[in-house]
């Protein structure tokens, strides 16, 4: 499958797989410098737009190295890019550390995973089938 990528800025970097076994395509900051203060969130530009085939979405996910080394992660993870969106891909980053973080142009800021989407038919129901769990959630099955 091919992913069409349009550079919206000449200096934008095309996403790529860092290794042959990588699931996600690395996305890059196109801005000269982005400063993120502690607990601040910012919208970071990639300078690219994509065209996904119908039946697929792109999920924007954090990079583990950025989270571990700088305390920065993708806020709405995973972010969803629908197949009919043609605007610039931007990434919402949040600095969870107690120090100011600088993201430089060309730095990898997130990864993009292309996944199939299943469409369902929504049917209103008066009752749902019983299960052992029922409405238990938020740790109801135990912590250990």
Curated annotation (Swiss-Prot):
Top-level taxonomic group: Bacteria
Catalysis performed (reactions): dUTP + H2O = dUMP + diphosphate + H(+)
Gene3D superfamilies reported for this sequence: 2.70.40.10
UniProt keyword annotations, A-Z: Hydrolase, Magnesium, Metal-binding, Nucleotide metabolism
EC number(s) on file: 3.6.1.23
Pfam families, sorted: dUTPase
Family assignment from sequence similarity: Belongs to the dUTPase family.
PANTHER family xref list: DEOXYURIDINE 5'-TRIPHOSPHATE NUCLEOTIDOHYDROLASE
Name of the protein described by the UniProt record: Deoxyuridine 5'-triphosphate nucleotidohydrolase
Species of origin: Hydrogenobaculum sp. (strain Y04AAS1)
Organism lineage string: Bacteria, Pseudomonadati, Aquificota, Aquificia, Aquificales
